[in-house]
Amino acid sequence: MDMASQTSALYMRTHLIGASGGLQLARLVAGDPWTAGAIDHLPAELEEEMAFVRERVEELSGHRESWLGAVVGLGSGVRGVAGVLRVTRGRFRRVAALEAMRSLLLAKKAMWELGMEGRVDFGPGTARCAELNDQAARQATELQALHQRAADEAFS
């Protein structure tokens, strides 16, 4: 694997690690009755995006990235701890959880932007980066609306 491919694969792996925690948080927040189904679609979208990135990492590295499954497993542990702490229950916890999710989504959006610019090697999937960038913008807007509502409730 050449240096450019190594760099792209490492960058994408880093995003996958963050995405695994983000996916678990998204499942918790989407499962909160307070959201009234507004982001029920988010976990499935995140899973699909992660599969797309993982596939490209495997193409670049030339081997199966089996360790990524373990990272997602760790994310499940994070979900368990977060569930015990009830990160989506309580006015301020909900605000903080939504802020964390939105931050992760904006980091992911930056990855898609770099892919669109050709700085990160998505190969034949480069064209899909624009679609995923638009999807990330929509997801962030949805979370912003929930965050605003949560903040109104928390600080009123």
Which residues are covered by each model-predicted region?
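Carboxylate-rich helix-loop segments that flank metal/cofactor sites and access channels
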Residues: 59-91
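Hydrophobic stripe of amphipathic alpha-helices that form coiled-coil interfaces
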Residues: 26, 33, 53, 60, ...
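Preference for long, well-ordered alpha-helical segments
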Residues: 104-156
